[in-house]
Amino acid sequence: MKDAKPFPVLKNDNLLRAARGEVVDRVPVWVMRQAGRYLPEFQELRKHHDFFTVCRTPELACEVTMQPLRRFDLDASIIFSDILVIPQALGLTVEMHAGVGPVLPQPIVVPEDLKRLTPDGALSRLSYVGDAITMMRHKLEGRVPLIGFTGAPWTLMGYMIEGGGSKTMSKAKAWLNEHPEDSKLFLNLLTDAIVDYLEMQVKAGAQMLQVFESSAEHLSKEQFLQWCVPYLKRIRDELVDRLTKKAIPVVPMTLFAKGAGHSLKEQSELGYDVIGLDWTVDPLEARNLVGPNITLQGNLDPQDMYRDPDELRNLTTEMVHKFGKSRYIANLGHGITPQTPITSMEVLVEAVHKAL
């Protein structure tokens, strides 16, 4: 895991300062999926390597993580990986199909199928992520902080039951109604694996963590509070407890629950330093709901990246003015999409930095 060589000193810590509510030189900006298909060099690398081969090969994962930093003046890097590495480590096959996305050919269909999962040894099967994080910290040479991440329990459960992405999550939602006790068992099993995984990432050198509850959008507020919030709280509490007991510095944590703008106040009470917002949430309303002691991240509509540069510049500037310079990390309200023009990233990053 973490090698003996000390990590380079961090030169640009605006991301971490913003997360902690400290004064920043400039509003930090990074973009979800900033290492990805909109970059021609990523497409080129993918011609030669399968998606999960890139994830599992630290040198390749680092190369892809570095690609956006060579082009843009970003304030953070995020290790190249995928939320579905946890289902893989738990024994499920995950394949990436062109034009379709992730496919899990043997999904969890009935509660009996939970016996197929292999939590013992799951963490050791994820060691390649830790290796990539440690390698990346050295390759960054202190330029910007490195973010680690995970999928959240409900989101992972959804993929594992649906057998891939879903527009409705109907099978997974049916589980919550028809098998409530087994659903709790499933979510707790995933929570245990996630806490182990995040602890490993911090030990390997991750300087910040993001928890992606991307499928929160399929749940009502009542369901979100029942089936997401207790597990999201447990992730934060148990990780902090473990790191503290081992005298490892606690890194800032971001919760991004897409589509859960209805529960921002509740999210702000879970102990996370940063709350990520999707583009449907008004920045001023969000600030009123979470109060002054939480950092907000977001939330430009990824579709706005297809506008002409002047429009994009104006929208970005307006967004930053709404959030303000304190306790704010600029980002999109979801991942950047594959056909996004490169120039839009240049405009976004420059506009954020010049806005205030």
Curated annotation (Swiss-Prot):
The entry lists its GO molecular-function terms as: uroporphyrinogen decarboxylase activity
- According to its UniProt record, where is this protein located? Cytoplasm, Cytosol
Which reaction(s) does its UniProt entry say it catalyses? uroporphyrinogen III + 4 H(+) = coproporphyrinogen III + 4 CO2
Residues marked Transition state stabilizer (site): D82
Binding locations of coproporphyrinogen III:
R33, A35, R37, D82, Y159, S214, H334
Q: According to the lineage, what is the superkingdom?
A: Eukaryota
Pathway listed = Porphyrin-containing compound metabolism; protoporphyrin-IX biosynthesis; coproporphyrinogen-III from 5-aminolevulinate: step 4/4
Predominant place of localization: cytoplasm
Give the record's keywords alphabetically. Answer: Cytoplasm, Decarboxylase, Heme biosynthesis, Lyase, Porphyrin biosynthesis
Cytoplasm: present as a keyword of the record?
A: yes
Binding site residues for coproporphyrinogen I: R33, A35, R37, R46, D82, Y159, S214, H334
Is Transport included in the keywords of this UniProt record?
A: no
Q: How does it assemble?
A: Homodimer.
Q: Which protein family is it in?
A: Belongs to the uroporphyrinogen decarboxylase family.
* Purpose: Catalyzes the decarboxylation of four acetate groups of uroporphyrinogen-III to yield coproporphyrinogen-III.
PANTHER family given in the database record: METHYLTETRAHYDROFOLATE:HOMOCYSTEINE METHYLTRANSFERASE RELATED, UROPORPHYRINOGEN DECARBOXYLASE
Q: Can you say what this protein is called? A: Uroporphyrinogen decarboxylase
Q: Which organism does this record belong to?
A: Drosophila melanogaster
The UniProt gene name for this protein comes to Urod
